[in-house]
Amino acid sequence: MHYPNNRTEFVGAPAPTRYQKEQLSPEQELSVIVSALQHVISGENETAPCQGFSSDSTVISAGMPRLDSDTCQVCRIEGCLGCNYFFAPNQRIEKNHQQEEEITSSSNRRRESSPVAKKAEGGGKIRKRKNKKNGYRGVRQRPWGKFAAEIRDPKRATRVWLGTFETAEDAARAYDRAAIGFRGPRAKLNFPFVDYTSSVSSPVAADDIGAKASASASVSATDSVEAEQWNGGGGDCNMEEWMNMMMMMDFGNGDSSDSGNTIADMFQ
């Protein structure tokens, strides 16, 4: 649509300077907006020069040189307000596709560079390391490599030493047997309860473990008493008590005469 130019022209208006840009008329501004909208809706990459302008619609002052930098590359109008800021729909789609391809390629590169992905692609199995310290219940590893097993006696509220083993599995099975002896089938085991069904019944096993614990406690108490009596005061009274105790112990074993003579000969 072409609007007639009703603006009055002043004859005595001064000529614009060399560095002053050309001013667009309202008709030119409207044509620029319409062409830009048509360019966006149609989706064309390149737009032909606008044909709606006549030679008399463009006002060019006399002696004003043309500058190529002021001419729009889309609508070919000098002093355009922004045709270059509009993108065609197909250009936007291509730009989005390029961004998606870049993101996908970067993620694929990171995935291929990781050693876990390489191992999975090669058919290898990814194994998780098992914590050796907490591998079995009631088992601890000594600094020199062997494995020690112990269990807590629920009746006496004490720890029962089960021994030292070459492998962690042997120590774990020793713990399981002791746990079955204390708690029966309700015990928390390292291995299934079916593996121990052919073992000794639970009351007998519990009595054996309790007997071992009491025997070790009595031996340690006897050793401590003997050490106190031997290092006590060095008097005749302490020596006689110690000799009498040793004779009574030997008498219980059935060799009272020989042991008594031997002890008497030692202190004569």
Curated annotation (Swiss-Prot):
Q: Where is the composition biased (Basic residues)?
A: 125-135
- The superkingdom listed in its UniProt entry is Eukaryota
Subcellular locations according to the entry:
Nucleus
Task: Output the PROSITE patterns linked to this UniProt entry.
Answer: AP2_ERF (PS51032)
GO cellular component, as recorded? nucleus
Q: DNA-binding region at which residues?
A: 135-192
Keywords recorded for this protein, A-Z: Activator, DNA-binding, Ethylene signaling pathway, Nucleus, Transcription, Transcription regulation
Where is region (Disordered) located? 97-139
**Which intervals carry biased composition (Basic and acidic residues)?**
109-124
UniProt-listed GO biological process terms: cell division; defense response to fungus; ethylene-activated signaling pathway; phloem or xylem histogenesis; regulation of auxin mediated signaling pathway; regulation of L-tryptophan metabolic process; root regeneration
GO molecular function terms noted in the UniProt entry: DNA-binding transcription factor activity; transcription cis-regulatory region binding
Q: Pfam family of this protein, just one? A: AP2
Which SMART domains does this chain map to? AP2
Q: What does this protein do?
A: Probably acts as a transcriptional activator. Binds to the GCC-box pathogenesis-related promoter element. May be involved in the regulation of gene expression by stress factors and by components of stress signal transduction pathways.
Cited PANTHER family: DNA-BINDING DOMAIN (PTHR31190), OS02G0764700 PROTEIN (PTHR31190:SF181)
Record text on subunit structure and interactions:
Interacts with MED25.
Protein family per UniProt: Belongs to the AP2/ERF transcription factor family. ERF subfamily.
Please identify the protein, giving its name as recorded.
Answer: Ethylene-responsive transcription factor ERF109
Q: Source species, please?
A: Arabidopsis thaliana
